[in-house]
Amino acid sequence: SVTP
């Protein structure tokens, strides 16, 4: 996942 990608954390903004």
Curated annotation (Swiss-Prot):
Keyword annotations of the record: Mitochondrion, Ribonucleoprotein, Ribosomal protein
Cellular component GO terms, alphabetical: mitochondrion; ribonucleoprotein complex; ribosome
Compartments where located: Mitochondrion
Major site of localization recorded for this protein: mitochondrion
Summary of the function given for this chain in its UniProt record: Putative component of the large subunit of mitochondrial ribosome.
Protein name in UniProt: Putative large ribosomal subunit protein YmL1
Upper classification of the organism: Eukaryota, Fungi, Dikarya, Ascomycota, Saccharomycotina
